[in-house]
Structure formats: structure tokens, C-alpha cells
Amino acid sequence: MDALALLRPMMLIRAFEEALMRRPDHGFQLLSSGEEAIAVGICAALGPDDALLSSGRSIGPALARGVEPAAVMAELLGRTTGPCGGKGGRGHLAQPAVGFFGAHAVVGGNLTIAAGVALAMTIEQRPGIVACVFGDGACGAGALHEAMNVAALWKLPLVFVCDNNGWSVSTPRAAALAPARLSDLAAPFRMPAATVD
């Protein structure tokens, strides 16, 4: 994939979020500022049969996966023309038709859902994989370890992607998590892991 094909969606995410925050009715949002490449890189590796689930920081992943900007804006502003009829907002934005199986506002709430989607794909013998993006704050949640255990045990087509921005809401990572490298959390489950910067 050429660099411009990756740069364009990153610029779209940045411009979209900046335009959103200029609106007086933008509400509470979690932005992707400086992290646009994470969503774009993940989505560049996904195929049409693959599913993406994100944390509550959903705008970048939704746009990168192909949800139309006008539809995302409508959802964020509570309009009925949004993919969830304006009821999901940022924290529960979804559009499965384009492979964006949704966001979850609860820290780590998307992890077990992703395992369920991967299990359904396996049972139904559907092609594709599930990519689940979560923040480093979810690394201390039991749901991560439960989802990783099930994924490893049942050999589910599930890729865990930790977007480590160093903060769990307002707690610095070093005060909340013991591992120096969060990718080491995969070791007990004998899952391949890598730290990418």
C-alpha cells in the first residue's frame, strides 16, 4: 500500500475531529489526535470479511473502517440519520455492514464481545478475523485476560491491539500496571505478541 493511501484517511480523521470540536454542540468526545495512524494501520491490514471493534475512542476506527463521515457526525450529534439512529453516540457507534462491529464506552467492554464475534465466525465457518482495539487502561481488567484465554484455548481468529497512550483515564500507566511491556501480557496464553511504536 502506498504512503498516500495511508495518509489520506489519517488526514480525514484529524480534519473530522477538528471540525467536530469547533461545533458548539459537540458534547463529550474522546479524540484520536496523534493516534490516527493506529486505526488506519489496522484497517489497512483488514479485508472485507474482517470485523473491527474499538474502545470508546471510536471516531478514528469508524472512519478508517469506512463508515461515512456524514453518518459518523450524525451519530455523534444524536441525529436519526446516524448508523445507530443517533442512540449510540461516540461510545456505542457501530456499522456492521462495513465491518465496524462497534465501540464500547466501558473500559475493556469490547474485549469479550470481540471474543464472541470471533467465536460466531468460527462456528459459522465464516472467513475473516476480528481485530479488537482497546486502551492500556483495559489491561488491568479481568475481561482482557478472560478474552485472551478463550481466544487462545479455542484458537479464535482474534487479534488484540492495545492502543497504549500511557493513561487509564487519569491514572498514569506506571501507577496501574506492573508489566514494563504490555505485550508481555500475552505470554501466559502462549499468544504471539509484539510491541510496535
Roles of regions detected by a PLM:
Residues 4-7, 30:
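Hydrophobic alpha-helical segments at protein termini of multi-pass membrane proteins
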Residues 8-22:
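N-terminal glycine-rich anion-binding loops that anchor highly charged ligand groups
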Residues 18-154, 172-178, 182-190:
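Cofactor-binding active-site loop characterized by glycine-rich and histidine/acidic residues
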Residues 154-174:
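A short, conserved beta-to-alpha structural element at the edge of catalytic cores
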Residues 192-196:
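Structural signal for short hydrophobic segments within the conserved structured cores
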